[in-house]
Structures are given as structure tokens and as C-alpha cells.
């Protein structure tokens, strides 16, 4: 029966996130447990993809999960939603692992059909709906309407330097939320291509946020695994605003999820400026911009 006590037809049943209960019927406890231990399971699709992919220009980053006990190899493609793969991509994944792949793509005449990832595996083609999220590429130097910055990462550290134009002093934060005063919100993800099968947009242990409040006695606030005491922050005020240099101890790969939101409070108004085009950065790490360059596979 299902979670609500409704009877489920006996026979082969598709396993999903919705649980159901097995009942012993006329079997004894020992007979029932023996049958459960020997219950046959069939994995029709041993390789699955995360429900989202991250697009940067003409590249789409996807993550494939091999849920079987055998190495799997096949061909990866994309269709629908006005996108297609430039050419099929061959893949090979060890058992019980997940791996990210970079798929070259191009735009085609827009179609009404949804975007689907195609997996040709063991003689069968599987089609999986996928949400394509477009991310901005951030270089070593970047600009916002009211700021400019430099970003470096590698060798166990992230180094960020920024010059912010904000000549209106909002005073100390006091009881206000940090993002409702003069503040620089920083978003980091040291493993941005890790896309789980469930809730790939959710923050992970590799995601953290930092808040810089230049007008406060305590100027650095952290959320996540990074501690403020482990960071080195230097802030200087100037007639047009302020500048800072921030060094963060963090292991990174070739790509870094990164974004900036500058909050400028002046009286009863609040101006917000964001580096990338991502929405709801405070809860969706897949919306972060991407910095760095991944080497060819």
C-alpha cells in the first residue's frame, strides 16, 4: 500500500521518491523478511542526469550519475528549446559515481518542444527533461555600474579586490538586516559543477556567503563553512566610496561559482546592483556567475 494506506496493485512497481509499504500477508515474519532480502530489482536506466544544466555561451555543463555497479559508457546529446548539441559527446563513467561533462551546443530555430538531454546507452535512447540555466562568465577583472573588481583563485585561496562608488554613508547597520544598509554581498561556490539528482540548486557545503559592511565596527560577516576569523579583510574609505582587499582560505577547482550584490542605502531608498543576471542568489547556487576556465576533457 502507499503512504496514505491505499492498496497498490501487486507485481512490478516503479520506484520513485514516493514511498510505499510491503505487507507480509499470509507469510510468517521469517518468510516475509527472506522474500524482502531476495526481492529482484531491475535498473532500466543505470545513468541519469541532474534536472538542470549550466550554460555559459555555447557550452552546457551537465552532470551524469551512474547508479549501477558497472562502468557505463554511451553517447550524450541535446535537443529542444531552440538548442542542439554541436555533435554527440561520448562518455564513460565508473560505477557508483557522478561526473560532469561539457557539451558544445548551438542555437537553432526555436521550437515549442521542451529541452531534453538524450542518453544513448546499451542500445536504448533515454530522453530526460532538463532546465538550462544561463550563467555569466566572469573574468579576472569585472565591472558593475558602481564598482570594479579583480578576482584570483587557486593554491588554497580566493583573493578579491574591489573599488565601490558609494559616497552616501548609511551609518552603522544597527538593527537593520545587513542587506538593507551599505553592504557588499559575496556569493561563492567552490564546486559549481556538482549537480545532484535532487535539488541541484540548493546550497551545499561548498557554498558560502560573505557580507562586507564598511561603515560598521565589525565589517565582515560570514554564512557557511568559512569563518570570518580565517579571512583577511582590509578596507579603505575614499571620497567616492570605499575599496577593499579580501583573502579567503578555500580550495577551488578550475571553475568557481561567484557573484556580487552591492547594497547602497541612502535615506529611505535602497539601490541594489548585481554582477550577473542570476535571480534569487540567496538560495539558488546555480544562478551564480562562473569564474575561471575549465580545461578540455
Would you name each region that the model predicts?
Residues 1-48, 238-270, 275:
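Beta-strand-rich recognition/accessory modules
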Residues 10-12, 52-57, 94-100, 131-139:
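Solvent-exposed, conformationally flexible loop/turn segments
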Residues 1, 79-88, 223-232:
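Short beta-strand and strand-turn-strand segments in soluble, beta-rich domains
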Residues 110, 114-297:
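Structural preference for beta-rich elements and adjacent junctions enriched in aromatics
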Residues 54-61, 155-159:
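Contiguous beta-strand segments within globular domains
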Residues 2-13, 82-110:
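Intrinsically disordered, low-complexity Pro/Gly/Ser/Thr-rich segments with frequent PxxP/GP/PP motifs
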Residues 63-70:
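Asparagine-centered strand-capping/turn motif at beta-strand->loop junctions
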Residues 24-58, 107-134:
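Terminal connector regions
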Amino acid at each position: 500500500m502507499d503512504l496514505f494506506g491505499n492498496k497498490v496493485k501487486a507485481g512490478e512497481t516503479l520506484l520513485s521518491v514516493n514511498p510505499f509499504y510491503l505487507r507480509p500477508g499470509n507469510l510468517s515474519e521469517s518468510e516475509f523478511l527472506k522474500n524482502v532480502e531476495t526481492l529482484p530489482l531491475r535498473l532500466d536506466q543505470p545513468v541519469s542526469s541532474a534536472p538542470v544544466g549550466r550554460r555559459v555561451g555555447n557550452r552546457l555543463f551537465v552532470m551524469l550519475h551512474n547508479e549501477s555497479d558497472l562502468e557505463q559508457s554511451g553517447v550524450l546529446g541535446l535537443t529542444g528549446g531552440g538548442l542542439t548539441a554541436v555533435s554527440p559527446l561520448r562518455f564513460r563513467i565508473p560505477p557508483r559515481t557522478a561526473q560532469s561533462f561539457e557539451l558544445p551546443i548551438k542555437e537553432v530555430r526555436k521550437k515549442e518542444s521542451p529541452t531534453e538531454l538524450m542518453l544513448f546507452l546499451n542500445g536504448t535512447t533515454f530522453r530526460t527533461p532538463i532546465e538550462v540555466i544561463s550563467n555569466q562568465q566572469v573574468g579576472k577583472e569585472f565591472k558593475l555600474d558602481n564598482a570594479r573588481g579583480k578576482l584570483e583563485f587557486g593554491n588554497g585561496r580566493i583573493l578579491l579586490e574591489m573599488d565601490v562608488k558609494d559616497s552616501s554613508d548609511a551609518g552603522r547597520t544597527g538593527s537593520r538586516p545587513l542587506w538593507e544598509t551599505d553592504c557588499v554581498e559575496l556569493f561563492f561556490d567552490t564546486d559549481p559543477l556538482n549537480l545532484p539528482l535532487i535539488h541541484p540548486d540548493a546550497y551545499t557545503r561548498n557554498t558560502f556567503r560573505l557580507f562586507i559592511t564598511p561603515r560598521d565596527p565589525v565589517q565582515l560577516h560570514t554564512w557557511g563553512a568559512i569563518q570570518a576569523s580565517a579571512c583577511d579583510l582590509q578596507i579603505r574609505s575614499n571620497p567616492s566610496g570605499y575599496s577593499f582587499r579580501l583573502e579567503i582560505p578555500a580550495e577551488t577547482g578550475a571553475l568557481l561559482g561567484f557573484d556580487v550584490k552591492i547594497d547602497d542605502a541612502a535615506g529611505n531608498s535602497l539601490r541594489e546592483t548585481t554582477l550577473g543576471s542570476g535571480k534569487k542568489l540567496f538560495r539558488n547556487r546555480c544562478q551564480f556567475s562562473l569564474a575561471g576556465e575549465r580545461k578540455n576533457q
